Amino acid sequence: MTEEYWKGVDKIQYVGHQDKKSGLGFQYYNPEEEIMGKKMKDWLRFAVAYWHTFDQRLVDPFGDGTAQRPYDKYTDPMDLALAKVDAAFEFYQKLGVDYLCFHDRDLAPEGDTLRETNANLDKVVDKIVEYQKTSGMKVLWNTSNMFTNPRFVEGAATSPYADVFAYSAAQLKHSLEIGKRVGSENYVFWGGREGYESLWNTNMKQEQEHAAKIFHMAKDYANEIGFDAQMLLEPKPKEPTTHQYDFDAATTIAFMKEYDLDKDFKLNLEGNHANLAGHTYQHEIRVAREAGLLGSLDANQGDKLIGWDIDEYPSNLYETTAAMYEVVENGSIGPRGGLNFDAKPRRSSFAPEDLFLGHIVGMDSFAAGLRVAAAMKQDGFLDSLKADRYSSYKSGVGADIESGKADLKSLEAYAIDKPQSELIAATHSDHLEEIKDTINHYIIDTLSK
């Protein structure tokens, strides 16, 4: 019988508004409850990130790791890797999630050659596949870590060294094969070092062409082996490079269109990455969904007082409400999307149970956001605001502009003799403060029921 790793933790249940001191439990996430005709678990499709949850030691630039994990007794790298799989699947069962996400290098130690590394990885994947058969766990997405090893010091696909490009392509090939084995619904590309430190020594066009080339290779090989996954690019503006090529949603969409990738690729968007790019999470989701390219979401939050990626568990209800409003407007997160918790406990939250507590606050925060977003959508609150605001385009000159009937000459004839008083009289206050106050009331009222 497999050792119990997460002792003292039972399966997390929906407890509603019981006193939080009554124990671990969800206050707002009730997986089977229907919201706007769909179960909460189907709206949210929560996933656990293998790297932050089971590998992260809570290090920072000024101190060693503080994490206490129930598998720390294992010292042999392969024994540890296999023990983590046992611990992970117990964690998934107790938390009550259906999906996991992983990088290839999260799972197993590297060998001296790619052949040795692949052999290590295959042993761990064999065990994951066996657990999938008995647990029903699915993989939301998998990916390749092509940023940690020193070989990727100047990128993977965008490296100036052809040997590194070749190695990256070979690593990617095996990662796609693993994706097929575990039935991954999506495949993510996050280019942690696909950018530059300085433009003085960078051939930007060549590097971006190489990135596009490897993306096309990946899609072609996935088709060849019958790996039917949605391909996703994940924007981030910087860190670890000074400037990453997939800066934000708009930049990445432009890149996709430039290199004919937008038919096969969509976006995986992260809250903290949006903040680093100077945007709200809602902004990035809006840009992607209005382009028809929203694929999946990474759930975390940043700290606006801190200028780097901290991957904190989401707890800001205003932000989760805004994000979930975009999802409700879209009808889903994406064709195969979900909410992956790319998040870790704070360095001072080092106990094993903090991993459960972090996921609970994140899952509850997005479930709460879904409840509030659905209430606003069903009431038509924001829809009516926008309809009123743009009502001048429903008739007269506005209708001519919308239909394409108007041109510069006809619009000059319409506007040339209009006095300023008439133009100003046509404008109306947005009452933004009232809108924000109303949203606050929706949050308070919906979550107190």
Swiss-Prot record:
Q: Which UniProt keywords apply?
A: Carbohydrate metabolism, Cytoplasm, Isomerase, Magnesium, Metal-binding, Xylose metabolism
Magnesium found in the keyword field: yes
**MF terms in GO:** magnesium ion binding; xylose isomerase activity
* Reactions it catalyzes: alpha-D-xylose = alpha-D-xylulofuranose
Cellular-component GO terms for this entry: cytoplasm
Q: What is its EC number?
A: 5.3.1.5
Cofactor section? Mg(2+)
Q: Which SUPFAM superfamilies does the annotation name?
A: Xylose isomerase-like
Q: How does it assemble?
A: Homotetramer.
Family classification: Belongs to the xylose isomerase family.
What name is this protein filed under?
Xylose isomerase
Taxonomic source organism: Levilactobacillus brevis (strain ATCC 367 / BCRC 12310 / CIP 105137 / JCM 1170 / LMG 11437 / NCIMB 947 / NCTC 947)
